[in-house]
Amino acid sequence: MMNDIIADGLTRIRNAAMRGLEVTQLNHSKLMEAVLKVFEDKGYIESFKVVEDGNKKFINVTLKYDENGNSVINEVKKVSKPGRRVYKGYEDIKRFKNGYGTLVVSTNKGVLPNDEAYKLKVGGEVICSIW
């Protein structure tokens, strides 16, 4: 039994990127789908697609690599965990890794990257970081 689908999904993405795989499959959740939408908008993954296999849903993620074959994802980490939730105000999420990285924040306006959350002046739970 898996307790944290987001942590599992991020680990699968990290492992697939280290192995140089083109596509990896994740378990589906609405939150994971929203996180992947942020990754896609920010250019960390090529695309993702929700597929149904009987009564189960999965997400197929196509990873992105540069011209040398290196993954564009250097590091992806879960920040807020089930035992230790991390909440930040909008002032605290302005920049991450001097603008080279992205924090994914769950706000009352939806799941947003840190720069959009700062523009909208909303804080929330920091789900993960990627750069």
From Swiss-Prot:
It comes from Nautilia profundicola (strain ATCC BAA-1463 / DSM 18972 / AmH). One of its GO terms (molecular function) is structural constituent of ribosome. GO terms for cellular component: ribonucleoprotein complex; ribosome. The keyword Ribosomal protein applies. Keywords: Ribonucleoprotein, Ribosomal protein, RNA-binding, rRNA-binding. Belongs to the universal ribosomal protein uS8 family. One of the primary rRNA binding proteins, it binds directly to 16S rRNA central domain where it helps coordinate assembly of the platform of the 30S subunit. It comes from the Bacteria. Coiled coil: none annotated. Part of the 30S ribosomal subunit. Contacts proteins S5 and S12. The keyword rRNA-binding applies. GO terms for biological process: translation. This is Small ribosomal subunit protein uS8. InterPro entries: Ribosomal_uS8, Ribosomal_uS8_CS, Ribosomal_uS8_sf.
